[in-house]
Amino acid sequence: MSGWDDYIKLLFGKSPAIKRAAIIGSDGSVWARSGDANAFRATEVELKRFAALFNDINSVPGTGADLEEIHYIVPRVEEKLIFGKKEQTGFFAAKTNQAIVIAMYEGDNAQSASVRAGVEYIAQYLASSGY
């Protein structure tokens, strides 16, 4: 792939439920984000705080997570994965050594499975490429 934006396009192709997406560095810096009507709207401050959640991932279900000025409950975390939910919206975020892949989605639990699969696919690809 030629650029970070290509990974965002590929992620959107993995699930129609994905509405916005970003790839950020482990420091919260933005590497790529969806734009236009699907603009990923998280602020720089939110992204720095969000990236730091992976430093103590097991505490995240107790506190939740904030993205795009929305507070999400976090019913589940895994070693390098955070799942956030609020009503019929949510996100999946997967961390690699240097990056965090985030996809915001709308839909029910059945649709969330394809979102998770897409996020994990991109994260695994980045990890295998040294990121």
Swiss-Prot record:
Principal location: cytoplasm
GO cellular component: cell cortex; cytoskeleton
Localization annotation: Cytoplasm, Cytoskeleton
Source domain of life: Eukaryota
Key words, A-Z: Actin-binding, Cytoplasm, Cytoskeleton
CDD domains: PROF
InterPro entries recorded: PFN, PFN_euk, PFN_sf
Record text on subunit structure and interactions: Occurs in many kinds of cells as a complex with monomeric actin in a 1:1 ratio.
Protein name, as recorded: Profilin-2
Species in which this protein is naturally found: Caenorhabditis elegans
